[in-house]
Amino acid sequence: FERFTVWFAKYVLPIVHSKKTILKFLSINDIDEQKKFYRDQWDSRRWRLLFGLASSRLVLKRFARQYSMFTYNKIKTVAVIYRKRLERNLNSVLAKNNFFLHYSLMGRYGEELPLYLQEKEYLHLKEKDLGSILSINTIDLSTYLKSQPANTFSKFNLSDIFEALSPSENDVVWEEIIRTAKNGAVVVYWNNLVKRLYPIQLSAYIKNNEEKAAVLQEKDRVFFYDSFHINTIIK
């Protein structure tokens, strides 16, 4: 996905907007001014055409995302949905402060950096013995969780991983999440193009925090997700 994003910034966007226009867009300090700039100077027919091509189902499936992420997605107008989500995001998040949008439009980060790349946080990570607390596994989540003892994890950050699962596979993963979670563990995840929630038969073990999720989604720098979810595991 990162390579695809750099390709978009390097080869597609310059066909639409000059570097001067891009830098202006990324320097605006006011939401209302940003909305006006997007409406009057950014949202051209050429922008819609090339954004539509670059974020079409065919292109994303071939170059940007794993093919399996589209197995259960039946939406054909993916590009239109993503453009509308971008516009929704620009109504509440300044592009200037959005490192993801900087990367998407420039092909690199500007002054705004993800936390782990900021000097203070980088030095904090550098001081830690990451080898003793971090492990990398290249197996699917269901298999990994089945290999772990019960009551192991306090946090789950699962991105939009449920997107690629069938309803039955989704249920199995949630059963394993509950089994391996400590009481009070927090599970966060996103829905993108496929709606996947925890199975209703497990609702006795799961508490929703929809209000907090809605507040945080308003601040989300990544525009293309549909919804953000926060669940607490109750045992």
Predicted features by range, described:
Residues 169-183:
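A short glycine-rich, Lys/Arg-flanked "PGG" loop and its adjoining helix->strand segment in the class I
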Residues 209-235:
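Core SAM-dependent methyltransferase catalytic element
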Residues 1-127:
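Class I S-adenosyl-L-methionine-dependent methyltransferase module
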